[in-house]
Amino acid sequence: MGFRIAGIVRRTSFYTTQAASKRVDVPKGYAAVYVGDKMRRFTIPVSYLNEPSFQELLSQAEEEFGYDHPMGGLTIPCKEEEFLNVTAHLNEL
């Protein structure tokens, strides 16, 4: 059984390029999160990760998904409205 190295390298390159292109649009100092049933994508300041109200959302994510987030960002299992309320409160701080 033989392997075609060129084909493997091309496929790996393709997947790496796709993953990199998804990360590029997240500004430095921000993180991508996916929220709600429709998995709407938001970018949040990484400073939110230290806030108790946001850590509660992270705990919910850990309970539901563990540390496996196939979307490439954090998946938050709450309604968009709840997420927007938490982030609006954090914006006021």
Curated annotation (Swiss-Prot):
Pfam families: Auxin_inducible (PF02519). The keyword Metal-binding does not apply. GO terms for biological process: auxin-activated signaling pathway. Induction: By auxin. Transmembrane segments: none annotated. Keywords: Auxin signaling pathway. This is Auxin-induced protein 10A5. It comes from Glycine max (Soybean).
